Amino acid sequence: SAASDVYKRQIQKPYGSTVDYNKDLIDRFNHGELMNADSIHFPDSLKVQTKKLGRTVYGGGGIMPDYFVPIDTTLYTDYHRNLVGKGVIIKFTMQFIEGHRKELANKYKKFESFNEKFVIDDNMLATLREMGEKEGVKFNEEQYQKALPLIKTQLKALIARDLWDMTEYFRVMNTTNESVQKALEILNSDEYGKKLK
């Protein structure tokens, strides 16, 4: 899921209610802040220099990340959104697990083995598409192909969540989360280590 991308600047920012939080998020999306770093503006009055490293930070709640990873909204197509909205993704996952629970438990005793070897195959995807049609989700080849990597990841993550827990769900989902992958790359780089000295 792209939660880490979306909520970056909400950290430490005070909100009176969930409604205020959601409104701010929608406003930021509409202003392009989640897609382009140039759309994020802070008044100069909020700039503060850190004492130790002399880095510029901003007061007033929220943070500005050192590196910006835009949200790619093209991966989440209308076709995929309709599969999710009509409950097809969840229904398919539950039916698959109930029909294969014993087999999955015997084959994948540890999550690491599941994560490395389990694949969402063509038969599973054909069943998903059929279920979608039955629920009134009209198949769209172009949108399906565009969303396919995300659909596969989501299905695998939901199966992992049922067999294990939320930690394993996120371990699968984060393999295709661009913000998480970029963060891991940066945190393991010499360049970022130098910034913190």
What are these regions (language model features)?
Residues 10-197:
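Conserved functional hotspot residues or short segments at active or partner-binding sites
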